Amino acid sequence: MQTVDQRIEKLRELMEEKGIDIYYIPNEDDHLSEEYTADYFKCKSFISGFSGEAGCTIVTKDFAGLWTDGRYFTQAEHELEGTCVTLMRLRQEGVVDPIPFLIDNTPENGCLGFDGKVVSSSDAIHLSKELEKKNAKLHTTDDLVDTVWGKDRPSMPQEEIYIL
C-alpha cells in the first residue's frame, strides 16, 4: 500500500509525462454528485488521504492542497498530518477558492489537467476561457488518478437501477 506522499509523487510523474502543470481532483462522480459517491469515485480521498465527503485536491509540481469546509477542518488536520498535503480551509481569510486557485496557478503557456467526466461543463468552460488569456490549455481526457490507483481501485457500481 502506497503512502499519500508516494501517490502524489506518482501523480506528479504522470503529470510531467503528459505536460500537465496543475491537476484538479474534485470529489464528484460522473453524475456530478459530490457527497455519498461510490468508492470508485473517491479519487480525492485516495490521493490526499482525507476521507471526508466535501472537498477537492489540487496538485502542482511543488504543492498539494486539500480544500474543505469548516465541517471537516478537525478531521482533515488529523488525516493530513505527516503528509505533504496542505489543508486549505475554505471560506477562511487568505484562502483562495479552488477554481480561482487553478486559474492563478496555471502558468502562462501551461496546462491544467483533470478527468473531464467529473467536472461540470460550466466549470470547464469558465476555466478554458480564463486559461485562454494565459495561452494555457486544458487536458481533460486522462484520469491520472486511475493510473496511480491501478488494479486496487474499487470497481464501478454494478447494481441495477430502479425507480423510487
Annotate the PLM regions.
Residues 2-107, 111, 115, 119-164:
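N-terminal accessory/capping or targeting/presequence segment of soluble
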